[in-house]
Amino acid sequence: MARNTLSSRFRRVDIDEFDENKFVDEHEEAAAAAGEPGPDPCEVDGLLRQGDMLRAFHAALRNSPINTKNQAVKERAQGVVLKVLTNFKSSEIEQAVQSLDRNGIDLLMKYIYKGFEKPTENSSAVLLQWHEKALAVGGLGSIIRVLTARKTV
């Protein structure tokens, strides 16, 4: 048995700092300090005003907030992507989809299904056109990967 059992020197941990209501994830703090993830709305708007739809499309899909838990960031990114998708002409959709790799098509499908969850006026018809073209390029595997993915946009 230890000689000094009445000593309280071993109690150096402050258990009040580990209160679950005060818990702050360091990963989220680092992401907030490094800048918000997601597409840059100013860059995308500038490209849309110039009429460069393909570059606006790629800029909207770049830096997607997949790993963040912040719903406001995800909603803002969804709005930017939906704005780009609705500005495309139906004849240009196929070219834009074919410019993506497999991961890009999966990301596009995630945004399409997220748009189906919260439809706005005329967005469903546009999203169905995008879905048709993305399905033709990505196949059924892209739908399965999106529906079974744990990380959402």
UniProtKB/Swiss-Prot annotation:
Chain coiled-coil ranges: none
Gene3D superfamilies listed in its UniProt record: Actin-related protein 2/3 complex subunit 5 (1.25.40.190)
Phosphoserine: modified positions: S64
This protein's GO CC annotations: Arp2/3 protein complex; cytoplasm; glutamatergic synapse; synapse
Entry's Gene Ontology molecular function annotations: actin binding
Record's signal peptide: none
Disulfide bonds: none
Family according to the record: Belongs to the ARPC5 family.
Function recorded in the entry: May function as component of the Arp2/3 complex which is involved in regulation of actin polymerization and together with an activating nucleation-promoting factor (NPF) mediates the formation of branched actin networks.
Protein name: Actin-related protein 2/3 complex subunit 5-like protein
Gene designation per UniProt: Arpc5l
